[in-house]
């Protein structure tokens, strides 16, 4: 991958990722970025988490690592399936747009559990496609619900809707606890413009609604078509 263009992979998720990271405690120790590439996420990670200490990046692409090191990251060549780090040496870890490229995701997630100290957290973001209910009216309705629930927006984003269930299970099986996951439809207005719109599990949406709004929501869901859509999945574990 051209390292000059790889930042575009992360751009659609930037606002959601910032919200998720902002709701997590500051890491008590170095922050690990597995699959760091050229370090395009460094500024976001430092500003959102106020990471004044070590930011450790691991990648197998040495050219990209050179660019990451110039950006202030401690860049290490390594394999996500066998991290070249001591047990419990990191305060937290992120794995962004990387998990889907690994041939043994369970092993990689167990390695992340090994190197993150007890009490630390993990954030995973990956891409997939899935058949799911969707409509323009349902999209706009969900956006309005999120705007109404500004203070609890992260709670609504990570409700583990069905497309995110397998990712949540995968992370739990690797030894992580308190796992929460969300799914986000990637909408492309044109070649240069993308945005992500959250899918909210029906149970979680129903718990937020008055009887009148619940009837409106049920009608929208019943009217929605099943489509094969590109999704971004995001999950956290402790």
Question: Which residues does each PLM region occupy?
Answer:
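A short SAM/SAH-binding and catalytic strip from SAM-dependent methyltransferases
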Residues: 91-104
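Class I SAM-dependent methyltransferase SAM/SAH-binding core
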Residues: 32, 38-82
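Class I SAM-dependent methyltransferase Rossmann-like catalytic core
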Residues: 1-14
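A short glycine-rich, Lys/Arg-flanked "PGG" loop and its adjoining helix->strand segment in the class I
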Residues: 106-118
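Conserved Class I S-adenosyl-L-methionine
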Residues: 165, 178-238
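Conserved alpha-helix/loop element of class I SAM-dependent methyltransferases that forms part
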Residues: 11-28, 44
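Conserved catalytic/acceptor-binding region of the Class I
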Residues: 123-187
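A short acidic, Gly/Pro-enriched loop at the edge of an enzyme's catalytic core
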Residues: 81-93
